[in-house]
Amino acid sequence: MDVFMKGLSMAKEGVVAAAEKTKQGVTEAAEKTKEGVLYVGSKTSGVVQGVASVAEKTKEQASHLGGAVFSGAGNIAAATGLVKKEEFPTDLKPEEVAQEAAEEPLIEPLMEPEGESYEDSPQEEYQEYEPEA
């Protein structure tokens, strides 16, 4: 049972990390969009204020999206049976959890399951085929 709970805990951490990575990617995209829009706005007279406003709204929406992805990940984990809905924390902020996960060292290295090897298997030699004329 302890192994099962550890597996669920690792799955929860994975869901949280995935949600944070998604949020981080969207936030970075919003920042780049903001930079691009501000550059274009600086070349066009009279629209800089409106452009900055649009860029800031884009950044805010990226933050909201990250939170939605986090709660959606919890719903997916519950629907697949990985965790019970009531076990999934609802009061966590994705950015806080991801920061904690990044600061904690990995207790034990990830290992391959016994008997399984992920190395490339040797490829068979093939004879070249030459069609008859």
Swiss-Prot record:
UniProt keyword annotation of Nucleus present: no
Modified residues (Phosphoserine): S45, S117
Keywords: Cytoplasm, Phosphoprotein, Repeat
Region of interest called Disordered, as start-end residue ranges on this chain: 96-133
MF terms (GO), sorted A to Z: calcium ion binding; cuprous ion binding
UniProt entry tagged with the keyword Phosphoprotein: yes
InterPro entries named in the record: Synuclein, Synuclein_beta
Chief location of this protein within or outside the cell: cytoplasm
One GO CC term, this protein: inclusion body
Location within or outside the cell: Cytoplasm
Sequence repeat intervals: 20-30, 31-41, 42-55, 56-66
GO process terms (BP): chemical synaptic transmission; dopamine metabolic process; negative regulation of neuron apoptotic process; neuron apoptotic process; synapse organization; synaptic vesicle endocytosis
Region entry 4 X 11 AA tandem repeats of [EGS]-K-T-K-[EQ]-[GQ]-V-X(4), spans: 20-66
Effect of inactivating the gene: Simultaneous knockout of SNCA, SNCB and SNCG exhibit an age-dependent decrease in SNARE-complex assembly. Thus, synucleins are required for maintaining normal SNARE-complex assembly during aging in mice.
PTM annotation, UniProt: Phosphorylated. Phosphorylation by G-protein coupled receptor kinases (GRK) is more efficient than phosphorylation by CK1, CK2 and CaM-kinase II.
Residue ranges, compositional bias (Acidic residues): 97-133
Tissues of expression: Highly expressed in the brain.
Domain of life assignment: Eukaryota
Function: May be involved in neuronal plasticity.
UniProt record similarity statement: Belongs to the synuclein family.
UniProt name for this protein: Beta-synuclein
Species annotation: Mus musculus
Lineage: Eukaryota, Metazoa, Chordata, Craniata, Vertebrata
Gene name in the database record: Sncb
